[in-house]
Amino acid sequence: MRILVIGLGVQGIKRVKVAGSDVSATVDPQNPSADFKLIDDVPLNAYDAAIVCTPDLEKLRIIKYLLVNDKHVLVEKP
């Protein structure tokens, strides 16, 4: 399964390490090592599931976007 990790803070970086080679891309508007700045820029055919590790205020829009596009979603708790 190809995984997109959204948010490269402490938890996001941990998730990248755990998912390893299954990570197809990362998204973070502030981390220069991320593959993309915005989730909208990631091709939908590039991943099957996403791990959302963002601040709480950003989660709802991201989760809605992923679900509308038929993606599996794992969300870090607040």
Mark where each language-model region is.
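Beta-loop-alpha module in the N-terminal Rossmann-like domain of NAD(P)-dependent dehydrogenases
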Residues: D35-P78
